[in-house]
């Protein structure tokens, strides 16, 4: 079970989830220093991503890192196609596909939020605050029509001899599930690309300035789109080359091997990008968790300078800009 691949994923995924939780606590603590709609989307993303992360251990991580006679193999041998399971494995497999829809749609919403900020900077916040409850309902409900058939199905683990590991499957035709998922992902990816291109083009043509913080969050949403595009390509590869006829081929093995890493990219990259692109986020993060090393960048003329402080109270108001 504890293969090099499994250890590698744990090496970066556990620190990433800890950092994710720390940044969520940070934006909640310094809520006045960030856009309210951005905070709401960030926290919702965190909830969905943490569910995805822990669910992946059951549907992807542990099965893919368990050989035929490994310590944990008895769990998978007891739920084969000859002895399929229903609850709760069907729920975990349902969540596996459900979250693919939810994550892609949330990346689109993040880009849409930045798009509306660029084009309607004076009114976008009020509009998003009013619409946000309905947006969340849409995020929750939207994947259900595409994934509900998994819930009443029989679910099991299949052993792949060439890779000496297990994978999750169900009585629902795999091609049927991917034939629904791929058009959705392609449509959302294209829509995300269009609004990101429009946002960056508008940014270069603007005669007035938006805050550096808002601009950097736009760059963050653009970077999330790149990860989304990679996930789309890998999912397409899974659909085209992983089937009963060639599931033991090299391309099938590559697609299956990359799946947990691509999933991690969608799930764990947010806090790293947030801190990388947002100076304000880095300041608030340092102020909250490492106050002795926190730096402020405020002067009487609003120019930027950095000073080291020893007390949180010295910079409590200075981080807003």
From Swiss-Prot:
The chain crosses the membrane at residues 1-21, 38-58, 89-109, 131-151, 181-201, 217-237, 254-274. It is a multi-pass membrane protein. It is found in: Membrane. One of its GO terms (biological process) is sensory perception of chemical stimulus. GO terms for cellular component: membrane. Signal peptide: none annotated. Its main location: membrane. One of its GO terms (molecular function) is transmembrane signaling receptor activity. Keywords: Membrane, Transmembrane, Transmembrane helix. It comes from the Eukaryota. PANTHER family: SERPENTINE RECEPTOR CLASS GAMMA, SERPENTINE RECEPTOR CLASS GAMMA-33. Belongs to the nematode receptor-like protein srg family. This is Serpentine receptor class gamma-33. It comes from Caenorhabditis elegans. The lineage of its organism: Eukaryota, Metazoa, Ecdysozoa, Nematoda, Chromadorea. The gene is srg-33.
């Amino acid at each position: 079970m504890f293969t090099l691949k499994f250890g590698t994923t744990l090496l970066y995924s556990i620190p990433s989830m800890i950092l994710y939780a720390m940044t969520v606590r940070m934006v909640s603590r310094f809520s006045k220093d960030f856009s309210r709609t951005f905070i709401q989307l960030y926290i919702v993303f965190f909830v969905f991503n943490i569910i995805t992360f822990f669910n992946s251990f059951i549907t992807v991580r542990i099965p893919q890192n368990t050989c035929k006679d490994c310590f944990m193999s008895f769990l998978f041998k007891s739920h084969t196609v000859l002895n399929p399971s229903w609850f709760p494995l069907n729920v975990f497999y349902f969540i596996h596909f459900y979250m693919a829809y939810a994550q892609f749609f949330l990346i689109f919403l993040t880009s849409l939020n930045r798009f509306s900020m660029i084009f309607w900077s004076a009114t976008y916040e009020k509009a998003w605050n009013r619409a946000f409850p309905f947006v969340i309902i849409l995020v929750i409900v939207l994947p259900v029509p595409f994934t509900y058939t998994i819930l009443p199905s029989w679910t099991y683990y299949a052993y792949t001899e060439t890779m000496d590991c297990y994978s999750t499957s169900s009585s629902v035709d795999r091609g049927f599930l991917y034939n629904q998922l791929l058009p959705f992902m392609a449509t959302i990816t294209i829509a995300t690309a269009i609004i990101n291109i429009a946002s960056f083009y508008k940014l270069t043509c603007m005669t007035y300035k938006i805050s550096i913080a808002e601009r950097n969050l736009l760059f963050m949403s653009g970077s999330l789109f790149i990860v989304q595009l990679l996930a789309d390509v890998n999912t397409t590869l899974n659909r085209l080359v992983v089937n009963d006829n060639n599931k033991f081929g090299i391309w099938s093995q590559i697609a299956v091997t990359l799946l947990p890493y691509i999933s991690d990219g969608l799930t764990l990259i947010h806090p790293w990008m947030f801190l990388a692109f947002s100076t304000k986020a880095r300041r608030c993060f340092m102020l909250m968790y490492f106050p002795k090393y926190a730096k402020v960048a405020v002067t009487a003329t609003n120019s930027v300078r950095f000073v080291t402080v020893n007390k949180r109270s010295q910079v409590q108001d200075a981080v807003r800009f």
